[in-house]
Regions:
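Intrinsically disordered, low-complexity terminal regions
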Residues: 1-300
């Protein structure tokens, strides 16, 4: 107990006095517990769960609150899920582990999982990982790295360096500022914000990117999908060196792109598989690619 107090951790054990919540629903047994951490400044938070969603929300104050919702077919199975929590200064690690061999319960089709619901100061460094489950984050500024083996990622009202990765699932980013790197093996991508660096890829899915009015490129952008359409909306005054290509589809361009290819005067569009040229004053490269699908470039 003394060591826990030294690092500022309050762990709630599963006893009536500790306030641990135990319940039962159609998804089996549920046990909820909390862990609290006090920090001076921006925390460096590492979250890991083997299976389960992760939800993070930025709040005022200097505390990190991690609520852990453990589920399983029986109370014994839930109790075997181990929560490891440590703190060293601003560095906080919380990991939920399942036993090496899970219990088999005949007649109950419920596997074990552990969902994390986290309140964190608005300025933070975060690494959140789940083997299977969605991740949501809202209202946080800093380096934010979110990874899931199978599940969607939703991001809103964030600022900083964003790294998003899912093996199978959609990615949605709303009202973001900073640098963005994202990848999904299979899923659609929808992004809106004021981003200076953009690197997006999906193996199979459409991409929609809406750049805010103040958007300016600080480095080359890469936007690609193996199979799906790409739609990009750019503000007035935006400048880039465009390199767009589709393996099977057409490019519909409504921007003023300076090229050596004459404009189709009848339609006011350029319908082709490759389009290269300057947008505005040119500058950093904007590379847009799809293996199979159309590309649409429009003013916002």
């Amino acid at each position: 107990m003394r060591s826990a107090l030294r690092v500022g951790i309050v762990a709630l054990a599963c006893t009536p006095l500790a306030g641990c919540v135990v319940g039962v629903d159609s998804q089996g047994q549920i046990v909820r517990e909390e862990k609290r951490f006090s920090v001076d400044g921006a925390p460096d938070l590492r979250l890991t769960t083997f299976d389960g969603a992760i939800e993070l929300r930025g709040t005022d104050g200097g505390q990190v609150l991690v609520e852990i919702e453990k589920r399983g077919p029986t109370r014994e199975a839930v109790d075997e899920l181990k929560v490891e929590a440590t703190q060293e200064g601003r560095r906080i690690d919380v990991e939920v582990k399942r036993p090496a061999r899970e219990r088999m319960v005949f007649g109950i089709n419920v596997s074990t999982s552990a969902k994390l619901i986290v309140s964190v100061p608005r300025h933070a460094t975060i690494l959140a990982r789940t083997g299977d489950g969605g991740i949501r984050i809202e209202g946080v500024e800093g380096r934010l790295e979110l990874r899931t083996g199978d599940g969607s990622i939703h991001v809103s009202d964030v600022k900083g360096e964003l790294v998003l990765n899912t093996g199978d699932g959609s990615i949605n980013v709303d009202r973001a500022e900073g640098r963005l790197t994202l990848e999904t093996g299979d899923g659609g991508v929808n992004v809106e914000g004021n981003l200076t660096v953009v690197r997006m890829h999906t193996g199979d899915g459409s991409i929609v990117y809406r750049a805010d009015s103040a958007t300016r490129m600080e480095d080359d952008w890469e936007i690609s999908t193996g199979d799906g359409s790409v739609s990009i909306y750019l503000p007035a005054g935006f400048s880039a060196e465009l390199d767009a290509h589709t393996g099977d589809g057409r490019i519909r361009n409504e921007l003023d792109v300076a090229t050596n290819i004459e404009r189709d005067r009848d339609s006011g569009e350029r319908d082709r598989r490759t389009l290269r040229g300057k947008i505005g004053e040119g500058g950093k490269r904007l590379r847009v690619q799809t293996g199979d699908g159309g590309i649409t470039l429009r003013a916002r």
